[in-house]
């Protein structure tokens, strides 16, 4: 029963993450800037998480030494979120999400380069496959795929990989309760985005009508609150490895949304590149299961 519960929650988490384009693209097409959209997303998410913390009677207290680390983590999360939305402009939501999903590969590369994680043949094969997959997507006949878009999408994955590594290698951050960490990442990230919007002179744009309100609320509830909570349930029931493998449904969902809702095209070559990257990600996740983690 716990296996079924974990698998169901893992799929729900991945699919809800993959629905991000469904709620963000209509708001962006209505004229809202990326900074403003993410500001609203983070503000509402921080509010919802704060309410959950109050209901659970969890403390908001952090120490002074936590602040610099939380700022670093929030900056990485900001970079990841902004660059992913930026990549949508160049590649479409499906392809951009697939390239963003290289983050497990990039996480492994960071750990090997800076934290002396041992290389293994499965990891090396997965990294080479990921590079090959990105190359297949980048080198399209007739120049149908933007190289700038590919770079931006991969940088969004690098931002998320850096976010994950900074949490894992810092014992202080790692020991913060999940809701508290989530709250401060959203809050600090939001403050940086607000400051940046006024420094650049764009400011925070107003919400344009009921449809934007609905999309922003669904973005927060479905793609932030539900996705994170179901992921936690999944990990507790089936372990992080299996939950991570189920996470491959995230880019698949984004591709389906792009095709069915936004009319994005998918060539055979693009599909092959996507499958190579997904296979590489599954290999890199399973290669961490050296001690039988389930």
Give the location of each predicted region.
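Glycine-/small-residue-enriched transmembrane alpha-helix faces in small-molecule transporters
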Residues: 1-36, 40, 75, 79, ...
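Juxtamembrane helix-entry segments on the extracytoplasmic side of multipass membrane proteins
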Residues: 2-7, 31-39, 62-68, 139-159, ...
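Helix-helix packing/entry segments at the starts of transmembrane helices
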Residues: 8, 14-15, 40, 96-102, ...
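Transmembrane alpha-helices of multi-pass small-molecule transport proteins
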Residues: 29-79, 106-107, 159-166, 182-201, ...
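Membrane-interface helix-cap regions at the ends of transmembrane helices
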Residues: 45-63, 131-145, 188-212, 256-260, ...
């Amino acid at each position: 029963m716990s296996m079924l519960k974990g698998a169901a929650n893992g799929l729900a988490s991945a699919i809800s993450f993959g629905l991000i384009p469904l709620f963000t693209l209509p708001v962006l097409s209505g004229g809202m800037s990326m900074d403003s959209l993410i500001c609203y997303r983070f503000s509402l998410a921080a509010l919802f998480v704060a309410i959950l913390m109050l209901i659970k009677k969890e403390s908001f207290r952090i120490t002074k030494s936590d602040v610099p680390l939380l700022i670093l983590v929030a900056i990485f999360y900001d970079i990841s979120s902004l660059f992913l939305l930026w990549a949508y402009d160049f590649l479409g939501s499906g392809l951009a999400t697939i390239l963003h999903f290289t983050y497990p590969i990039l996480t492994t590369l960071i750990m090997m380069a800076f934290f002396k994680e041992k290389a293994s043949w499965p990891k090396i094969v997965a990294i080479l496959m990921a590079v090959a997959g990105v190359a297949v997507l980048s080198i399209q006949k007739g120049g149908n795929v933007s190289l700038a878009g590919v770079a931006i999408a991969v940088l969004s994955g690098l931002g998320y990989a850096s976010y994950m590594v900074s949490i894992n290698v810092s014992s202080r951050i790692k020991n913060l309760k999940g809701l508290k960490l989530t709250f401060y990442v959203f809050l600090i990230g939001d403050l940086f985005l607000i400051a940046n919007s006024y420094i650049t002179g764009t400011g925070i744009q107003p919400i344009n009508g009921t449809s934007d309100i609905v999309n922003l609320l669904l973005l927060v509830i479905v793609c932030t609150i539900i996705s994170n909570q179901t992921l936690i349930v999944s990990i507790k029931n089936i372990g992080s490895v299996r939950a991570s493998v189920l996470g491959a449904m995230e880019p698949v969902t984004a591709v389906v949304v792009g095709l069915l809702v936004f009319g994005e095209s998918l060539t055979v070559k693009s599909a092959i590149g996507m499958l190579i990257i997904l296979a590489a990600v599954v290999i890199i996740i399973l290669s961490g299961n050296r001690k039988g983690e389930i």
